[in-house]
């Protein structure tokens, strides 16, 4: 049984299930309550009224840039810049943003936070009380400053180096080192630069202010940014505020295009023995790469059906291995299959198999190959398929609103962010569109989630 053979199997199972669900090449229904627009400077905005919770709103600014945009002498500065956004801006010097918001009951680390990944940087203020109009204007001014007015004063930069060093230390573990070895294999042959977000300790300790400002001025610009505001307010009035407040932000002259990176497919089967002498665990991981739909296809019903089907396959295969590991003679204590999107051009299907006791790595390989061969020859049983489908639907029930009135701000925000960064559909439960994403389940032959 070859890995190539199993890659073909996974694709074949997906095609079989996909074909059995009335294939359609139509866009997903769009939530008509979302106001999406683009300012003259290229900044995108998403606005939606939602009264759950009543009297509150979420405010986000999404930057379609991350560690991948760093030059070699800026390794780690995308993440460092995220920290500096809370250490002084034009209208909120030093810790002004945190002090101002916490005085109004909006807590740092809980309601106020941010994250940096390899491809994006997102700042947000959640569950902000809409006490008065002037306060809302001040919160929008925070987003405005995060767009183009982060100060990066020298003293604040120097003070923050120690904070970043400690974060670097806590992220340096056997697991993280093996993960980096793993990524080197997965990204081999691709155009992605080698970045790990936390960056190089040498850069963190020694970069000059001009270097972080170079990154900031080059990449923090409105044509790579989106404002997302969802909550209990008048949506048209909020749109007017955003147009008034954010239209003055300018792009730099001669904007450098953001490069689109692609993963390279595996050209042959390979085995890598990844060892860290400090690691106290053993695992067999098998990765398969498969084509991921282009951005233009990610708001289609067919795309969401494919995600649903991949979840079913993963759940069925994982459940089968769960039954096998109950035997005391099984060399594995746990076996799991997941299918992840790289958000670029390829899926990763991943099998993780953990040993029982002192079982040898070769016995785990045999366990994987036996399962792969059985799937290739016989596929899934009807009971396995139906049980996995039920599990996936129950999970969707758990993580999706069961009525238009129960959808929360964060659920809507997540869809807007995904639309901006990855081209996902703007589909949510609303009075005008009660089916939303659940049209996928109906098309796949399963009742919709609503009672």
Regions found by a protein language model. Give the residues of each.
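Bacterial N-terminal signal peptides
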Residues: 9-20
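An aromatic/glycine/proline-enriched structural segment found at the starts
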Residues: 226-282, 390-400
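Structured mid-domain segments that build the active-site/substrate or prosthetic-cofactor binding neighborhood
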Residues: 290-294, 302-383
């Amino acid at each position: 049984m070859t890995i190539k053979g199993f890659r073909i199997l996974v694709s074949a199972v997906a095609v079989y299930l996909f074909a059995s669900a009335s294939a359609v090449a139509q866009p997903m229904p769009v939530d008509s309550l979302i106001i999406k627009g683009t300012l003259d400077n290229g900044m995108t905005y998403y606005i939606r009224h939602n009264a759950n919770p009543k009297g509150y709103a979420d405010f986000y600014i999404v930057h379609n840039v991350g560690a991948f945009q760093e030059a070699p002498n800026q390794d780690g500065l995308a993440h460092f810049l995220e920290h500096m956004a809370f250490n002084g801006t034009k209208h909120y010097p030093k810790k002004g943003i945190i002090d101002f918001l916490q005085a109004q009951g909006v807590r740092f680390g809980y309601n106020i936070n941010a994250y940096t990944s390899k491809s994006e940087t997102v700042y947000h203020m959640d569950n902000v009380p809409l006490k008065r109009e002037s306060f809302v204007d001040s919160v929008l001014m925070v987003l405005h400053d995060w767009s183009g007015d982060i100060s990066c004063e020298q003293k604040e930069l120097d003070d923050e180096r120690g904070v970043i060093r400690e974060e670097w230390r806590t992220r340096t573990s056997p697991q993280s080192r093996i993960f980096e070895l793993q990524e080197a294999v997965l990204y081999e042959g691709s155009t992605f630069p080698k970045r790990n977000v936390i960056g190089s300790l040498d850069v963190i300790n020694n970069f000059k202010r001009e270097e972080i400002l170079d990154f900031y001025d080059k990449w923090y610009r409105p044509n790579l940014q989106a404002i997302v505001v969802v909550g209990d307010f008048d949506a048209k009035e909020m749109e007017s505020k955003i147009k008034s407040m954010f239209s003055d932000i300018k792009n730099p002259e001669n904007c450098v295009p953001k490069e689109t990176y692609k993963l390279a497919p595996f050209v042959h089967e390979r085995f890598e023995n990844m060892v860290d002498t400090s690691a106290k665990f053993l695992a067999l991981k098998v990765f398969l790469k498969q084509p991921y739909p282009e951005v233009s296809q990610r708001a289609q019903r067919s795309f969401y059906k494919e995600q649903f089907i991949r979840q079913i396959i993963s759940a069925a295969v994982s459940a089968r291995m769960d039954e096998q590991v109950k035997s005391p003679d099984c060399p594995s204590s746990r076996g799991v299959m997941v299918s992840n999107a790289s958000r670029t051009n390829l899926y990763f299907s991943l099998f993780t198999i953990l040993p029982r006791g002192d079982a040898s790595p070769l016995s785990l390989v045999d366990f994987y190959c036996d399962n792969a061969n059985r799937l290739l020859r016989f596929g899934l049983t009807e009971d396995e398929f139906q049980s996995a489908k039920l599990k996936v639907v129950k999970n969707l029930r758990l993580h999706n609103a069961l009525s238009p009135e129960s959808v929360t701000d964060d659920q809507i925000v997540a869809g807007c962010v995904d639309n901006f960064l990855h081209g996902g559909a703007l589909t949510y439960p609303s009075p005008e569109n009660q089916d939303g994403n659940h049209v996928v389940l109906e098309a796949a032959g399963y009742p919709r989630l609503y009672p």
